[in-house]
Regions:
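Active-site helix of classical SDR
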Residues: 124, 160, 168
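Substrate-binding pocket helix/loop in short-chain dehydrogenase/reductase
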Residues: 99-101, 105-110, 209
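Active-site loop immediately N-terminal to the catalytic Tyr-X3-Lys motif
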Residues: 101-102, 149-155, 177-178, 216
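Residue(s) in the substrate-gating loop at a strand-loop-helix junction
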Residues: 144
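C-terminal helical subdomain
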Residues: 184, 204-233
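A glycine/serine/threonine-rich, flexible loop-to-helix segment
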Residues: 1, 177, 189-212
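Alpha-helical segment proximal to the catalytic Tyr-Lys
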Residues: 129, 173-177
Length: 233
């Protein structure tokens, strides 16, 4: 796969940690030049440093994906840094602990939808024209198993991930004939810092999460990264 991707340019949002960091590192290991984007400057720069220490090439651009001007500047920054954009992994997202639907509040709804839905829409809105101008590209959006079904106390998050899948399908249909492939990955529970913080206080929750999966364990960030690179190849 590295021969297929080598020399190309990838943008990874939410690249400061977790799935985003692992995917940025996987792209770099395959010879791809990587633009890492995140609100967390320290984490994003840490990802870039790890890539460079491993012999890869990367730059960091701070970006709030909920703001149109910042996303526009991010994509322009990709073109300025490397001249093109071949792959985009729109991974930035949040999950706020929720109660039942009727107990939710407007602030939670707005925050989740702004990052998880508007953020993905804005990223594709600005990535697609650049890809069209260069003759094609590949986009992968991070959805979730929550976007394929439902679970208690996750109504807003589930709605946001259903929306990501809808955006992905629509973009895929609209731009396939123009050489742009658009797909989504739908992770279940993944072993990230966020997961560990959520379950460290109650090991029983971690055991329950592992038992939900046919493999008997939660997923690994490297497994999602491999799926993203496959979809880009």
């Amino acid at each position: 796969m590295s021969k297929l991707l080598s020399g190309q340019v990838a943008l990874v949002t939410g690249g400061a940690a977790g799935i985003g960091r692992a995917t940025a590192q996987a792209f770099a290991a395959a010879g791809v030049k990587v633009v890492v984007a995140d609100l967390d400057s320290a984490g994003g720069e840490g990802t870039v440093e790890a890539i460079r220490q491993a012999g890869g090439e990367a730059v960091f651009i701070r970006c709030d994906v909920t703001r149109d001007a910042e996303v526009k500047a991010l994509v322009e920054g990709c073109a300025a840094a490397y001249g093109r954009l071949d792959y985009a992994f729109n991974n930035a997202g949040i999950e706020i602990e929720q109660g039942k639907l009727a107990d939710g509040n407007e602030a939670e709804f707005d925050a989740i939808m702004a990052v998880n839905v508007k953020g993905v829409w804005l990223c594709m809105k600005h990535q697609i024209p650049l890809m069209l101008a260069q003759g094609g590209g590949a986009i992968v959006n991070t959805a979730s198993v929550a976007g394929l079904g439902a679970a208690p106390k996750m109504s807003i998050y589930a709605a946001s991930k259903h929306a990501v899948i809808g955006l992905t399908k629509s973009a895929a249909i609209e731009y396939a004939k123009k050489g742009i492939r658009v797909n989504a990955v739908c992770p279940a529970v993944i072993d990230t810092d966020m997961f560990r913080r959520a379950y460290e206080a109650d090991p029983r929750k971690a055991e329950f999460a592992a038992a939900m999966h046919p493999l008997g364990r939660v997923g690994r960030v490297e497994e999602i990264a491999a799926a993203v690179l496959y979809l880009c190849s």
